[in-house]
Amino acid sequence: HEAPFYGLHVRLTQLIESHERDLDKLFDFLTEPRRAVDCFPALFKREIGPESQGLATGETLAHLNCLLGRRRVEKHRDGDGVDWYRQKPETGDFD
């Protein structure tokens, strides 16, 4: 908001690389079915308290949806309407 911003391309590259690292960490974490809230430790370095739960859930779901779109994970909705995510297996279904 005052001085012009310089270094846009460098900063964009840094952001993309950071998100790709986070996606890889999340993918590695999904070796077993997990809910979005179970994935917080893969993405956040600190404990997520009630005041940050909404933002953390939104950020986690965005990463999970990206992995879904890339067909790296799959989602299963259980009988209670809870979504569970895991790495997409080579073969087979959710147990």
Locations of regions flagged by a protein language model:
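Divalent-metal (often Zn2+) His-rich catalytic cores of metallo-beta-lactamase-fold enzymes
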Residues: H1-F29
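C-terminal regulatory/interaction regions
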Residues: D24-D95
